[in-house]
Curated annotation (Swiss-Prot):
CDD domains: Cis_IPPS
Enzyme class: transferase
Active site positions, chain numbering: D43, N91
Keywords: Magnesium, Metal-binding, Transferase
Domain of life assignment: Archaea
Gene: uppS
Keyword Transferase in annotation: yes
Species of the source: Pyrococcus abyssi (strain GE5 / Orsay)
Example GO BP: polyprenol biosynthetic process
Reported cofactor(s): Mg(2+)
Protein task: Catalyzes the sequential condensation of isopentenyl diphosphate (IPP) with geranylgeranyl diphosphate (GGPP) to yield (2Z,6Z,10Z,14Z,18Z,22Z,26Z,30E,34E,38E)-undecaprenyl diphosphate (tritrans,heptacis-UPP). It is probably the precursor of glycosyl carrier lipids.
Name of the protein: Tritrans,polycis-undecaprenyl-diphosphate synthase (geranylgeranyl-diphosphate specific)
Amino acid sequence: MIYGILSHVPKIFFKPAYDLYERYLLEKVKAGVLPKHVAIIMDGNRRWAKKREKPPWYGHLFGSKKLEEILEWCHELGIRILTVYAFSTENFKRSKEEVERLMQLFEQKFRELVTDKRVHEYGVRVNVIGRKELLPKSVRDAAEEAERATRKYNNYVLNVAIAYGGRSEIVDAVKDIVRDVMDGKLRVEDIDEELLKKYLYVPNMPDPDIVIRTGGEVRISNFLLYQIAYSELFFVDVYFPEFRKIDFLRIIREFQKRERRFGR
């Protein structure tokens, strides 16, 4: 009965309590050990759009806006590295219209990054990781322009995984190592886990402390397979466009309570 009454109360009446709880969580999180690297599988854009009887691109558009919010949250907390899974190699199998819309959105967002005042004010370096040769030339050009425009920055790092697959990344790294062995630049005896890291799409990047997947699915979907061996995994039910700051803070708070053993 009480739930039935509360469900008819306008949400605006709960906002002061919500804001108070968010500030409380923020203070708790800031007082603890913060992750250096957060990775996100941005899942649920299409289902979020379908729930609203909108086409898939509508969900992807709102997903891109959510990513901008998350960048602000990371800046506020001092989380230096954010890696997001935007488009897998398997996603090319989606409908032609959806893929074309997504490519247009990627191109637009990369070009916006070049002139975004926050990117330059915060010192955000942009890396686009994946098999970029699979992307349309206009998207590749826009991605490379964003990388060039931010190459000198090192305060924060945004890795955008597009046309990406974790297995493909490992295969590409192994191919490069084999070439260097054949060219006499490396000895077989030199090959170890640390050397392989130097051949990944972003060489020597610290492994993610946290991996978050939105959308309710409990799987990794070929994301950063080499890098997440000891990452803390969090799966949340909300679709990516609905992912709130309070959800983000709760995850980090839970991360701070866990004992990381790194296989020991």
